[in-house]
């Protein structure tokens, strides 16, 4: 390939990449405005802001176990089910505003009642050489490491040189 062919091919490739990036950005912007328009139509129909909460209500009861389904939150599900069929047909990707269909059960341990971020107190202990006891029966088949052999291995690997050649 000549230099001119490489330059032309690179220019075409760069143009295609830029056009792909522009197309993705335009698509994302279209989806953003489409979903934004759906939200503004819902706001005009129902000005009650408590109904438009995208998050389920928080409960302080630790023993409350939430099971599958947003049916536990009727106030939150009414705004999601009132999207017009036209809006759903145009913006199918706007369904990410629906509440999650699963909830996690909180741990029932009463020990961590006052501790936040899910951690209890952790005790650390330093280990000395006397604390570590190795069972002699399990290492019976292994030989002890000879210090002379170890130094000989170090010398053998330190003498190796890397060889470079002209390209």
Swiss-Prot record:
The keyword Transmembrane applies. One of its GO terms (cellular component) is membrane. Belongs to the FAM163 family. It is a single-pass membrane protein. It comes from Mus musculus (Mouse). It comes from the Eukaryota. It is found in: Membrane. This is Protein FAM163B. The modification Phosphoserine is found at residue 40. Keywords: Membrane, Phosphoprotein, Transmembrane, Transmembrane helix. InterPro entries: FAM163 (IPR029379), FAM163B (IPR040280). The chain crosses the membrane at residues 6-26. Its main location: membrane.
């Amino acid at each position: 390939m000549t230099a001119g062919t490489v330059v032309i091919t690179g220019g075409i490739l760069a143009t295609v990449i830029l056009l792909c990036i522009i197309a993705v950005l335009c698509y994302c912007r279209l989806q953003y405005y489409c979903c934004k328009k759906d939200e503004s139509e819902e706001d005009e129909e129902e000005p009650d802001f408590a109904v438009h909460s995208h998050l389920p209500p928080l409960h302080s009861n630790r023993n409350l176990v939430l099971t599958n389904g947003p049916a536990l939150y009727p106030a939150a599900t009414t705004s999601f089910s009132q999207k017009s069929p036209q809006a759903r047909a145009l913006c199918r990707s706007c369904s990410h505003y629906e509440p999650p269909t699963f909830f996690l059960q909180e741990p029932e341990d009463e020990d961590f009642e006052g501790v936040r971020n899910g951690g209890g107190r952790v005790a650390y202990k330093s280990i000395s050489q006397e604390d570590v006891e190795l069972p002699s029966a399990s290492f019976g088949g292994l030989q002890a490491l000879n210090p002379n052999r170890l130094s000989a291995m170090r010398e053998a690997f330190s003498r190796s040189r890397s060889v470079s050649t002209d390209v």
